[in-house]
Amino acid sequence: MGLPFHYVDLRAFCYATEDEDRVRDALRTVLPPDAAIEAAEGEGHHGDPIVILSARVERSAEIDAIFDRLRESIDIDRVREELDERLDGNNAVYVGLDKQAAARGEIALGEGITLRAKVEAYPAKRETALENAREALR
C-alpha cells in the first residue's frame, strides 16, 4: 500500500544566469528516472526571462520512492514537526529543497526546488490530512 498522496509536484525556476540542463538535472535528483519535465516560459520581477521547470508524479510506487529518498537525505522529523505550517488550505504539503545541493546530486532542505505533495484525506479536512501526512512521514 502506497503513501497517502494523490500526486507529487516538483518545480524549479531557471533564471537567465543559470544553465537549464543543470536545473533539469537538479530536479532529476529527486524525480524517478523516467519522469517527464515540462518547461514553461515566464518573466521575472524585472522583466528578465525565466524558464519554469515542473514535473508531476502520480504513480504510487514512484511517490513512495521520492519519500524514501527524502527520508534518507533530510531531517524528516523536522518536516513532520512543521506540518501545520507546511500544509496549505488545499491539503498539500510543501517542502523546499536546496537547488544547488540537488545539482550536486544531493537532497537537502533549502530553497530553489518546491516539492508539493497533495495529501489524500477522506473527508477532505485539514485535521485528517495532517494525521495522514504525519503517519506517512514516519
Give the residues covered by each predicted segment.
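Long, hydrophobic N-terminal alpha-helical segment
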Residues: 1-37
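Beta-strand elements of well-folded, non-transmembrane domains
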Residues: 12-16, 31, 59-61, 99-101, ...
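A common structural junction motif
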Residues: 30-35, 73-77, 113-116, 137-138
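Mid-chain, well-packed structural core segment of small domains
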Residues: 67-102
